[in-house]
Amino acid sequence: IFRSPLSAEELRDQISDYHESDIADAFEQLSVEERKKLYPLLGAEWVAEIFSYIEDPDEYLQELNLDQAAKVLSFMDSDDAVDVLDELDDSTQEKLVGMLDEESSHDIKMIQSYEDDEVGSLMTTNFDVIHDTLTIRQAMRELIRQAGENDNISTVYVIDKDNRFYGAIDLKDLIIAREGTLLDDIVSTSYPYVTDHEKIDDCIEQIKDYAEDSIPVLTGEKELIGVITSQDLVEVVDDAMGEDYA
């Protein structure tokens, strides 16, 4: 359908019927010029989602001008954006990061500040967090507000008045909680975590044993700064196995 003589609106509607993974597969069959015509049609947010299914998105990002590329990066999860940027030359990296909004730029620089073998280099800042003083109703409202930006919502993290990690709540427990229930009654204060400067090799088995969708990453002062998802973990294990058999 990418090469069909449809109007821009008709083509966009047709493409929307397909999953982003399928669109990514189709992208690889198109020429550079064909993709360049599609990027403005799809928009930065959609392109960012499609890029998450492409093995080497940095190659496709370089088909965009700097302004377009920065917009796409701003819609990517921070850890994915870092992976893409790390494949670019230093000058291009610096220009793109400088064009991002303050929050995206901060998150990317923070992740890039860690050594490759440290937990912090794997984390994403895409997670939902609420304060332990909220009521059930307030917590649900806050979660709905954050859900538009963060899609890792199966686990909701809780911090105290000093912004230190307090625990976690399963989204299901929050949804079914009666309005009069105290937030403290459904928070798991023994929820596992890792610290940002821990070595990945030292804690990978421990994280696997937890069997959680995501694990919070804390600083030495117990400040919640990110999470490691199960998908991140799978990729690390796969990479390690690939090196072992190389």
What do these predicted ranges mean?
Residues I1-Y245:
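Hydrophobic packing positions in regular secondary-structure scaffolds
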